[in-house]
UniProtKB/Swiss-Prot annotation:
Gene3D superfamilies named among the record's database cross-references: plastocyanin oxidoreductase, Single helix bin
Top-level division of the source organism's lineage: Eukaryota
Gene for this chain: petD
UniProt name for this protein: Cytochrome b6-f complex subunit 4
Transmembrane segments: 36-56, 95-115, 131-151
Length: 160
């Protein structure tokens, strides 16, 4: 077991370095440019090479091949587009549907300006933002579930 030398805290040179914030690792190798210019590109290129190698050597199919002569009865988008699809499907005027879709991010952008006097991070002390979040989540789930149902029961989810 080696003997380590304890630093002499009465040394004025060491005290000056500690006062400047140089108490640890002022003798080491800097992260810039060594790590960022030499090590990170090697890791990134290695990751890309592994991905390309796997794609070339072992290609895998992403679902069934498309058949242009057999279309499904009802075409549904991916699951994350279900609420938007439901808005476009239920609104009779398509321009109004597009405007409703644009109103969602516009409404979310106005929430910080409505509650700009409230600096709290606690959601219970920010009632407007919490209410907008909860109502938006419920409406998005409701529209998403309704998009998977036929058009006549999509708005009521078949409950009424």
């Amino acid at each position: 077991m080696g003997v380590t030398k304890k630093p002499d805290l009465t040394d004025p040179v060491l005290r000056a370095k500690l006062a400047k914030g140089m108490g640890h690792n002022y003798y080491g190798e800097p992260a810039w440019p060594n790590d960022l210019l030499y090590m990170f590109p090697v890791v990134i290129l290695g990751t890309i090479a592994c991905n390309v190698g796997l794609a070339v050597l072992e290609p895998s199919l992403v679902g069934e091949p498309a058949n242009p002569f057999a279309t499904p009865l009802e075409i549904l988008p991916e699951w994350y587009f279900f609420p938007v699809f439901q808005i476009l499907r239920t609104v009779p005027n398509k321009l109004l549907g597009v405007l409703l879709m644009a109103a969602v991010p516009a409404g979310l952008l106005t929430v910080p300006f409505i509650e700009n006097v409230n600096k709290f991070q606690n959601p219970f002390r920010r009632p407007v933002a919490t209410t907008v979040f909860l109502i938006g989540t419920v409406v998005a789930i409701w529209l998403g579930i309704g998009a998977t149902l036929p058009i006549d029961t999509s708005l009521t989810l078949g409950l009424f």
